[in-house]
């Protein structure tokens, strides 16, 4: 039974690897994916939520 399951999984894996469609690449229109040389603020904004709950019992 394990051999049958293994054969099925291997067949499904190989069938998934043999897709005939072209690779999907997003259109960037000459723009980079991330902002390049973006200025980083010297100080973080004042209103930031606290990621750690700090209340005491």
Curated annotation (Swiss-Prot):
May I have one GO cellular component term? plasma membrane
* Lipid attachment in record (N-palmitoyl cysteine): 17
Q: How does it sit in the membrane?
A: Lipid-anchor
Q: Which N-terminal stretch is annotated as signal sequence?
A: 1-16
Q: What induces it?
A: Specifically induced within macrophages by phagosome acidification. Induced at 37 degrees Celsius in minimal medium, suggesting that nutritional stress is a regulating signal.
Q: Name one Pfam family in it.
A: LPAM_1
Which InterPro entries does this UniProt record tie to the protein?
A: Membr_lipoprot_lipid_attach_CS
- Tell me the segments the record calls region Disordered: 35-57
User: Lipid (S-diacylglycerol cysteine) linked to which residue positions?
Assistant: 17
**Which intervals of the chain form a coiled coil?**
none
Q: Other notes on this protein?
A: Transcription of the operon is maximal in early exponential phase.
What this chain does, per the entry, is described as: The VirB system could be required for the establishment of the replication niche in the host.
Q: What is this protein called?
A: Type IV secretion system putative lipoprotein virB7
Give the gene name.
Answer: virB7
């Amino acid at each position: 039974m394990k051999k049958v399951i293994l054969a099925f999984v291997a067949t499904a894996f190989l069938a998934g690897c043999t897709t005939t469609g072209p690779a999907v690449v997003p259109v960037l229109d000459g723009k980079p994916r991330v902002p390049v040389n973006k200025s980083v603020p010297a100080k973080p904004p004042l209103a930031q939520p606290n990621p750690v709950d700090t209340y005491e019992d």
